Each structure stands twice: as C-alpha cells, then as structure tokens.
Amino acid sequence: MTGIIHSLLDTDLYKFTMLQVVLHQFPQTHSLYEFRCRNVSTVYPLADIREDLEAELDALCRLRFTHDELGYLRSLRFIKSDFVDYLELFQLQRRFVEVGTDDKGRLNIRIEGPMIQAMFFEIFILAIVNELYFRRLETPAVIEEGERRLQAKAARLKEIAAAQNPDEPPFLISDFGTRRRYKLAWQEHVIRTLLEAAPSIVRGTSNVYLAKKLGITPIGTMAHEFLQAFQALDVRLRNFQKAALESWVHEYRGDLGVALTDVVGMDAFLRDFDLYFAKLFDGLRHDSGDPYVWGDKAYAHYQKLKIDSRTKMLTFSDGLDIERSWALHQYFKGRFKTGFGIGTNLTNDMGHTPLNIVLKLVECNGQSVAKLSDSPGKTMTNNSTFLAYLRQVFGIPEPRTP
C-alpha cells in the first residue's frame, strides 16, 4: 500500500530553507517537538488513528529523494549544491518519533532528535493526521459540498481579477494549506481550479511537490521554530531575534527576505528590526493578532526609519479566507505590496470542523523555548517559568484574563 506521503517534496518550502541554515550553521543542534490539538472536541477521538499513524510513519521513513526531485531543488537559486548533496543521502529516522495516547482519547506525538531530522517531520505528520482523521468522515456529500465551496471561491476570484486596477499593486494569494489539508489530491484540485479561474491572482503554493508538478512558484521563507531555536543557541536571550535574522541574511544574502514577526510579539520584534534589517528584508509576515493593527505598526516603523513602505511587502497568513484577504489588500494597497497565504480555508473547507493541530518546537539543546504570540491562544511552551522569564526580558505584560 502506498503511504499518504509518497514524496519528500510533499512539504512546505520553508522546511528546506530552514534546514539549509541549520545544516550550514548549527548542525549539531538537538530539538524536541510536541503535538497539540487545539479543538475542544472532535467527531471521534484522535487516539483511534494511532495504529494507522504508526504504519504511515514507517512508510514515510522509507522514502528517499529521487534524482528528479533533487534536480528540481538544485534549480532553485537559493538552494546550495552541497545541501542538495546532503539531501541525496537523507532519510528520516523512525526512532526519533514516539506516538502515544492518553485516557481521554488524545493523541500524543513527540519528535526528539537532531534538528536536521526532527524539523523535517512536522508537516508530514500533520498532513498524515489530518488525512487519517477525515478519511473516516468522507462521503459523496462531503466531496460535493467541498466542490460547491471551491467553485464559489473560483467565481469570487474571477470577480476580483476583473475588478483589479492594473495601476495598483496586485492582489496575490498563495496556497499555504499543506499541514491541514483534506488530502493531497484535493489540495491539487483546489490549486488547479483556482489557477484556471484567476491566474493573475494565484501566485503559488508553499507545497514544493505541487509547485514542481504544476509549474508554479514555491512560496516560503522561515517559520517560528527557526527564530525560537536561537533562544537556546549561543546568544543572549535578549538578542535571539537579531541573531536569527543575521543568520538568515548570512545564508541568503538578500534572497527569501520576508521576516516573521510574532515569536515574542510585534512590538518586541520592531525594537530589534532596526534600519539595517529594515533595508535588508523585503518585508514582514503576519501570523497572529489583529492584522490591521499589526500592519499599521509596520507602516509607522518604516516611516520612522524613512523607508518608503511601498517598496516593502506585507504577507498575511493567519486564519485567512479570500474575503478577509481582499479586505486587507484594500486597506494596505496604497502603502505596501501585499501577499496572502491561505491555508485551511482553501485545502480543507468541506463542511466539517477542521482540526486545529500543531507540532511545535518546545526544547532546543535541552533548554526550553517558547512563542509569545500576538494571539494568546497561540502561545506555546512546556515551561511556564521560562515563559515568564521571556516576558520579563522583552517587557511583555501577562495577557489580561477576561
């Protein structure tokens, strides 16, 4: 039986861009990732898929990159040849993943091992969990409803494409939905349908396998885990964001220039994002908190630094759909170029409640790391003492409880 994942390219581009930095700059780093389902309830306990998940992980760890896949990666100008040589030898190791359940029917997944291994498991495991869960709920009516919703999105994108003013910055969306997709075949169907409806709007996908197959642009730069790792590397905690951004610049020399802002919140990020970084990076990515407030803060920051914000890109990727994206574009288009990464709403809008699942970095080199998100529900760590210390170091107040 072919596994759910049948290509190691079937993941997000930023896994490759981050892994390349890890391999070149801190290959000895050890890390721990933990799974969490944020849903209050599910149709049936996730523990029920444990046996199938174990089998899928076994199949995943038998995969290797093909010469064709390696050739594609080599064609991306920011991927270095020695990294591709490393990937030719690469194989995920099953021993680094532990799967368990608890008495409440919850699924427990831990990935612990070298970061150059552990980091690469995340998207695969989330996509597998999603597909196993929704496979049991699939009926012809579910597919019919998914198709109806997809056709409505395609029609709306056609309307927007017709309404766009060619003299204004373009409205551009990308598929960011690999981790929470219904299944790979559906993700591909969604991208093909929207591309056909509005080729001027659909910019690409974060999924490298589908970007290669469909001949579109793979999209992505960095994730929270990259910046979080620097909380445990050889730098003062107060300087971890600067060290991470400096490391990125050293690796990519101006390529992949979109920085993620919400590891310790936008205000703390902007205190570190000085003139040097603001000139070097092409723009910023929003992934939590109020996107309008966030974008206005970004605009004020560029103004203060006397940088023309119209030369910069704001990328939004937090819980978006087409209407929210279009509204944000209308609000910011006079001040910024914009881009929108839409995830679950594209790849798993079938009428069911989607799974809100994550696999997050919680330790690096035996030391806790944390994300102090602009959305309190997205804060994640396994160490409340470290979280309090992080708040103190960056002057971030405790969130008010309602």
From Swiss-Prot:
The modification Phosphohistidine is found at H224. Its EC number is 6.3.4.21. CDD domains: PncB_like. Belongs to the NAPRTase family. Pathway: Cofactor biosynthesis; NAD(+) biosynthesis; nicotinate D-ribonucleotide from nicotinate: step 1/1. The keyword Flavoprotein does not apply. This is Nicotinate phosphoribosyltransferase. The gene is pncB. GO terms for biological process: NAD biosynthetic process via the salvage pathway. Keywords: Ligase, Phosphoprotein, Pyridine nucleotide biosynthesis. Transmembrane segments: none annotated. It comes from Neisseria gonorrhoeae (strain ATCC 700825 / FA 1090).
